[in-house]
């Protein structure tokens, strides 16, 4: 996450927060009191800098040995060496034993926090807005609840914005303020889709073209159904999409408003164009160069930064040689 064009904050699964100074290539640790637990696929997850605060998704445990995804915030002021007054705003319910599918990405839009919550390997829960499993949640910046979106469901939680997801690891805002997410299917069925209130992507009644890892059908066996919101793009076989971001900047002006997508499985960065809900120009930008790609971000100049998901993770920058 960029603080400015010279400074990036990086989260590490085990709980470390680092500030990278791109001007002098130094790394310093940020002190914090986030009650993070590294468990399974969980740990310190996403981070967003907004109006002198950091908004963070992380894994938290309870004294029964169960875990969940949580959202919190804290003050972050110059000289950027400490998070102060940290508070947890939301704990996804219920806590579960599973160490899988925590999500999670965070986005600030129209004065609200949006965060993706994975279904933790308990897909049947993602059809019920009375819990947070397999959903997008929406809360105010101070953690209070917003307008209920699933009021037609008994006991629905007011912060549940969208349901029926498996493991959403990307969340991005377009130039016209539409929100999009990336979601991991099982054996096939990864997708990009709109984030819309009171909608349901169908997991695990449908599998978006994928199957269970043992080869059996998912739910009804249908790839899609008119009962559920349909993705704008899906992949069979899976590409394992993680972070996504809409491109803006002068470095690659021809890519303006295109969506950049990282792929863990195929170790690539690709881009797509979206117009009126239709996808075109799916193009691979980078493949098999830096390993599994976990994160992508763009600075104000339009330079693209990537973080690899390897034992020795590295930061990479993509610039346009035609502009040098």
Task: Identify what each model region corresponds to.
Residues 293-295:
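Repeated scaffold domains used in trafficking and secretory/extracellular systems
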Residues 30, 89, 161, 285-286:
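Hydrophobic residues at beta-strand termini and immediately following loops
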Residues 42-44, 119-283, 291, 301, ...:
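Beta-propeller domain segments
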Residues 1-123, 170-185, 237-275, 299-320:
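Acidic, Gly/Ser/Thr-rich repeat motifs that build Ca2+-stabilized beta-propeller blades
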Residues 2, 163, 287, 298:
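Conserved strand-loop elements at the edges of beta-sheets that form or border functional pockets
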């Amino acid at each position: 996450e960029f603080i400015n064009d010279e400074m990036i904050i990086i989260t590490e699964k085990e709980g470390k927060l680092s500030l990278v100074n791109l001007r002098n290539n130094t790394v310093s640790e940020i002190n914090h009191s986030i009650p993070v637990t590294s468990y399974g696929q969980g740990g310190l997850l996403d981070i967003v800098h907004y109006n002198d605060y950091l908004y963070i998704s992380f894994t938290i445990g309870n004294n029964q040995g169960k875990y969940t995804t949580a959202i919190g915030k804290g003050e972050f002021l110059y000289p950027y060496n400490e998070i102060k007054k940290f508070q947890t705003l939301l704990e996804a319910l219920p806590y579960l034993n599973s160490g899988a599918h925590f999500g999670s990405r965070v986005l600030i839009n129209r004065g609200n926090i949006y965060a993706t919550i994975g279904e933790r390997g308990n897909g049947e829960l993602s059809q019920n807005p009375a819990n947070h499993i397999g959903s997008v949640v929406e809360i105010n910046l101070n953690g209070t609840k917003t307008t209920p979106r699933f009021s037609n469901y008994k006991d629905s939680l007011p912060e549940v914005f969208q349901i029926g997801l498996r493991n959403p690891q990307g969340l991005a805002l377009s130039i016209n303020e539409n929100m999009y997410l990336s979601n991991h299917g099982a054996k096939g069925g990864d997708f990009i889709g709109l984030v819309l209130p009171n909608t349901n992507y169908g997991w695990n009644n449908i599998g978006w073209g994928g199957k269970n890892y043992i080869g059996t059908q998912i739910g009804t066996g249908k790839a899609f159904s008119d009962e559920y919101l349909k993705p704008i793009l899906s992949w069979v076989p899976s590409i394992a999409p993680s972070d996504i971001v809409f491109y803006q900047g002068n470095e690659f002006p021809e890519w303006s408003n295109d969506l950049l997508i990282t792929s863990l499985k195929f170790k690539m960065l690709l881009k797509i164009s979206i117009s009126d809900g239709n996808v075109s120009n799916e193009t691979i930008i980078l493949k098999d160069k830096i390993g599994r790609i976990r994160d992508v971000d763009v600075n104000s100049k339009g330079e693209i930064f990537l973080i690899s998901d390897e034992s020795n993770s590295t930061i990479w920058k993509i610039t346009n040689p035609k502009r040098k």
